[in-house]
Amino acid sequence: MILLWLVLVSLFSSAEEQTENSFELVDGDRVLFLGGSFFERALDYGHLEMALTLRFSDQDIIFRNIGWDGDTVFGHSRTGGRRRAVFGDAEEGFQRMAKHVRSLEPSVIFLSYGTNESFGGIGEVPRFKKGLHRLIEMLGDSGKVRFVFLSPLPVSPNFIPDPSYYKERHSTLMAYTEALRSVAAQMEYPFVDLIRPLANAEFTTNGLYANSLGYRLIASQVAQQLKLPSPRIESTSSKAEILRAFIIKKNSLYFHRWRPRNDAFVYGERKDEQKIAQTEPAKFESFIVKQETHIREFLKSIAPKTP
């Protein structure tokens, strides 16, 4: 039944849900995934990045995922390491995020926000939109960066026994989704609606976070609504699974590059105790480059460049 739903949704299309023009990635693009739990948990699956890679396999594109559980457009999850009994505030997190993003020099940024902010209620929608505008202006590099907005995921009614609470959560998420759609339209950026197509699918681990099937369906929706070209090979093929494993490993290496487990010794309150620890994250760079080379070589073997 779940697979049938996946097939039906992948075939469903409407002008309302699609961008006016098709979206494309070009040679040399640096694609960034920025947001909260949606993107951090995507690291475990790799479906979205694989879908994009297979559709632009003859282009040399770099992907970086800096999603952070619980993050908001205000940078709440990205505050500095603890200094004695004090954590940094959201503004510090926002500035750290901006600095990190600029260092990566992205040309395309996929944004996933709204879920965490929605717990503030519908009354906080104006503040959310203001924060979103500020984020775009801060990271947009005077129009040089192309953005893609993703809506929040829906909540599953099967995991919420109280119908009234489910109705309230759904209404709130829809309000934040419409805010995202409005800002995207105002700034003329693509918007991908994940609320409506995924509303009735059993695609989550707990009613909130997507599982592997969920991320596969999400990748299908992104491709459909952005009118992406067909993949060079089917995403369910054995070769695609090999590619997905390569992508997951590369993303794991980059995760440890920018978010080391010994954060306190690298960036936080104990960084003066073990200075050698501050040099260790950069050592992941060579492994990341090597893994990306494997990915490009594998793509050439299954999808040679078009003449």
Question: Which residues fall in each region the model found?
Answer:
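Structural recognition of the beta-strand scaffold that forms the well-ordered cores
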Residues: 30-34, 62-67, 107-113, 146-151, ...
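Extracellular serine-dependent O-acyl
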Residues: 146-153, 170-203, 216-238, 254
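Mature catalytic domains of secreted/periplasmic carbohydrate-active enzymes
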Residues: 41-69, 73-78, 82-87, 91, ...
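Serine-esterase "nucleophile elbow" of acetyl-processing enzymes
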Residues: 6, 13-70, 74, 97-105, ...
